[in-house]
Amino acid sequence: MNIDVKVIAGARRREMRLEGSRLLVKVLSKPLKGRANEELIEYISEILGVKRRDVAIVAGERDPRKVVSIPIDEEALRKRLAER
């Protein structure tokens, strides 16, 4: 599934939650040399329990608003976020 993601880079702590149909993800890394994007992919795979190689940024590589491809459906996404 593709999901809209808003990334807040340089946050004090990592966080992931749904805001409507958009996933809000806070990462510690600054948006320099792709570090925040790498942390985003790593964090999504860790929290959702999917392989890192199966998570990809489809659009918005250099924008805080991104489209990310993840190999689970919306119901599973909501369930995994609620379990945290």
Q: Regions from the language model: what does each represent?
A:
Residues 1-3, 19-23, 51-53, 64-66:
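A generic structural signal for short beta-strands and their flanking turns/coil linkers
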Residues 1-16:
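Charged, low-complexity intrinsically disordered regulatory segments in eukaryotic signaling
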Residues 5, 44, 55:
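Residue-level signal for inorganic ion chemistry
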Residues 6-8, 19, 26, 58:
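Solvent-exposed beta-strand sheet faces enriched in polar/charged residues
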Residues 9-11, 20, 61, 72:
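A generic beta-sheet turn/junction motif
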Residues 10, 49-54:
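Short amphipathic beta-strand starts and helix->beta connectors
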Residues 15-48:
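Compact, glycine-rich, soluble single-domain proteins
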Residues 52-84:
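C-terminal structural segments of small proteins and small subunits
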